[in-house]
């Protein structure tokens, strides 16, 4: 007899509503099965609260006041190189900060609906739990370089 329900951890980021809404839609679908426990986590909760709030405010300000700056950063990030070093640094720190939450949830599978949670869990998987099943649901219009992470077992991409 199973000692626990199959646990799905949905991880999203509050950057754009699509990432969160995709996770909520998946949660609603999984919850129809009584044998599945579903937890929806926000990776910004891994930050100290003041940092998460500040980052989100700055991000939203850039989108509204300086969209050209966002476009420039997006293109830089999609080139690889130095941006991948930054991705690894950020995701490594967040994997460390979020490890208590992840251990507490003890998921059988993690589904990331944003590139940052995919990267965080890729590092967590490499460091702590290599057998963890990690999936990415690409919620962007294109597959950004930061989405491509070692350790992601499956990517899901909408076609229409």
Language-model regions: role of each:
Residues 127-160:
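Active-site-proximal region of nucleotide-activated glycan assembly enzymes
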């Amino acid at each position: 007899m199973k000692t626990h329900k199959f646990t799905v951890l949905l991880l999203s980021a509050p950057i754009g509503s699509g990432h969160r809404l995709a996770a909520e839609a998946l949660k609603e679908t999984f919850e129809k099965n009584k044998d599945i426990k579903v937890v929806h986590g926000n990776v910004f909760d891994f930050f100290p609260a003041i940092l998460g709030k500040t980052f989100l405010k700055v991000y939203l300000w850039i989108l509204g006041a300086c969209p050209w700056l966002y476009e420039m950063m997006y293109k830089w990030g999609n080139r690889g190189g130095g941006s991948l070093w930054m991705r690894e640094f950020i995701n490594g720190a967040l994997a460390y900060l979020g490890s208590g939450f992840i251990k507490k949830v003890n998921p059988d599978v993690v589904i990331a609906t944003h590139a940052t949670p995919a990267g965080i869990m890729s590092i967590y998987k490499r460091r702590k739990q290599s057998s963890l099943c990690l999936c990415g649901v690409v919620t962007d219009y294109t597959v950004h370089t930061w989405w491509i992470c070692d350790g992601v077992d499956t990517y899901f991409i909408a076609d229409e």
